[in-house]
Design a protein with these regions (language model features):
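C-terminal motif of bacterial Sec signal peptides marking the signal peptidase cleavage site
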Residues: 17-20
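Extracellular/luminal regions of secreted and cell-surface proteins that mediate adhesion/ECM remodeling
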Residues: 344-489
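Catalytic-core regions of glycoside hydrolase
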Residues: 178-182, 189, 193-330
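Catalytic cores of secreted or luminal carbohydrate-active enzymes
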Residues: 309-361
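Aromatic-lined substrate-binding rim segments of carbohydrate-active enzymes
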Residues: 83-143, 155-157, 218
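An active-site-proximal structural segment forming one wall of the substrate-binding cleft
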Residues: 114-131, 150-178, 200-213
Length: 489
């Protein structure tokens, strides 16, 4: 475990140095309506078949979902075996923090053997149904002596390493929930660099290299909101994040590694004046509404100044749109949340929590014809899903064979916390679809082709089963049976 008390003493100083330096939504194929938008015009459907409407009820059950929630502290991804992280899923988590240790390569290129082991580690992560919060760094100090001697690499070496890692990141993006900045300074937290990498220009160079290495639809989370505010004074809009080519501001979020631990979160929001510090907090809240946030708590330097009560985490978890949080540190916070009776709510609300209200679809259709549909839901979590993911109707015949119909324009990142969302549209049926009766299911599979058929990576809706109506979550298939039918004739 890292030297958190030591980090507390240095991060504020580094943030002070930073301050001194001054240094279209994809809705094709669907009509969307939200509480804040003007009512959409009625969609004229080609189909005149009667509609089957399913009303659904929410559940308070706490269950795992991909790319959100508490994470467990793991190991360098090159060391992940086929069974080393099975306990994570068994304990109800779907995320692990994987610190890539580059301390042996500060002055040389990454060997092919290390890159190959990274691929193997990610393959093993995939086998265990998990995703990574990934960070690479050149040092992980645990004592004051470690910190005083902590070394990173030169800018040219860092850029070379990122270029070497690019193919690995591209190949394994499906199991990388988010990449944290890393590389610069102590713990890869973008402060206290032995190679003077914390100047605005050098930080920007590392930022650009990381964005180049990542697929455009994967997020980069950085440590200090002052960096983002300097580069992008106006936070990105949701439409930018949902575009096929999102700009840099729409690809970068924040990780706060001393969440709630002091008045300025141990330097996270350090500024010369209280007003400037509050401006950074406001910026972080606005930016995280689109690009999400995560991190961990840490040992408070002054326990009396930490915000450890249930009211604090419930208020600020929502305000900063927290998607993921370290479950292994700091235990003092978790003890307070347990004692205050909110730990279960925190676990449920980290990230997204999508409750379906109604699902409607045509009840009769022809092979090769169109099927009208509509979906109404709300997000009761603290954040949007971090990565692209859309809905699909699944038609299941009497033999259990399934036909999947992706619903265009239903990227679930559109689900704003606390607000209702409704889509409607038509979807084409396969021309070769056999006549007969089909059970209708709703699914939200992983967007990656390699994981789309893996039920472990499917998003589970926060809805209760109903034995009377036939609504039932199908864990082996990763989809929700609606209890409704479609007749194809």
């Amino acid at each position: 475990m890292r030297a958190w008390t030591l980090k507390c003493s240095v991060l504020a100083l580094c943030a002070a140095g930073l301050a001194a330096c001054g240094g279209g939504e994809d809705d094709a194929g669907a009509t969307q309506r939200t509480e804040n938008a003007a009512p959409a015009p009625t969609l004229r459907l080609a189909s005149v078949a009667p509609m089957a409407q399913v009303s659904l009820q929410p559940t308070d059950l706490d269950f795992p979902n991909p790319e959100r929630g508490f994470y467990r502290f793991a190991t360098d991804p090159s060391k992940i075996t086929a069974t080393s992280l099975l306990y994570v899923a068994q304990e109800g988590q779907r995320l692990v923090y994987t610190p890539g240790d580059l301390s042996a390569y500060r002055t040389r290129n990454l060997p092919a053997s290390y890159l190959s082991k990274l691929d193997t580690g990610f393959a093993n992560l995939r086998k265990q149904g998990l995703k990574a919060v990934l960070r690479f760094a050149y040092n992980y100090p645990e004592t004051e002596a470690d910190y005083l001697n902590a070394q990173d690499a030169t800018l040219s070496r860092v850029k070379t390493h990122i270029q070497q890692l690019q193919p690995v990141l591209q190949r394994n993006a499906d199991v990388i929930a988010v990449l944290q900045g890393g590389f610069i300074g102590a713990w890869g937290e973008w402060h206290t660099s032995s190679n003077n990498l914390t100047t605005p220009a050098r930080k920007a160079a590392v930022r650009d290299a990381l964005l180049q290495a990542l697929p455009s639809q994967r997020l980069l989370h950085l440590r200090l909101p002052a960096d983002l505010a300097l580069w992008y004074p106006t936070p990105a809009a949701l439409a930018q994040a949902l575009s096929d080519a999102p700009p840099p501001a729409a690809r970068i979020g924040l990780h706060n590694d001393c969440f709630l631990a002091s008045p300025d979160d141990v330097g996270t929001y350090f500024a010369e004046t209280a007003a400037q510090s509050q401006a950074l907090r406001t910026y972080a809240q606005q930016a995280s509404a689109v690009t999400g946030a995560g991190g961990e708590t840490c040992e408070p330097p002054e326990p009396a100044q930490a915000r450890m009560a249930c009211a604090d985490i419930l208020r600020e978890g929502a305000a900063y749109h927290m998607s993921y949080l370290n479950r292994d540190y700091y235990e003092g916070f978790f003890a307070q949340w347990q004692a205050g009776g909110c730990m279960a709510e925190v676990s449920r609300r980290l990230g997204y929590r999508l409750e379906l209200q109604t699902v409607s679809h045509g009840s009769i259709a022809a092979p090769g014809g169109t099927l009208a549909w509509s979906v109404a839901l709300s997000n009761q979590g603290w954040a949007r899903p971090l990565n692209p993911r859309s809905l699909a109707l699944v038609l299941v015949d009497a033999q259990g064979q399934a036909a999947t119909l992706p619903l265009a324009g239903t990227d679930l990142r559109q689900a704003t916390p606390g607000e209702p969302l409704q889509w409607s549209g038509e979807v084409a049926l396969p021309a070769a679809l056999a006549s007969g009766s089909y059970q209708v299911h709703l699914a939200a599979p992983d967007a990656a082709a390699a994981l789309a058929g893996n039920a472990t990576y499917a998003l589970r809706f926060a809805n209760a089963d109903n034995a009377v109506t036939g609504v039932q979550w199908q864990p082996a298939q990763g989809r929700l049976a609606l209890g409704s039918t479609l007749t194809v004739q």
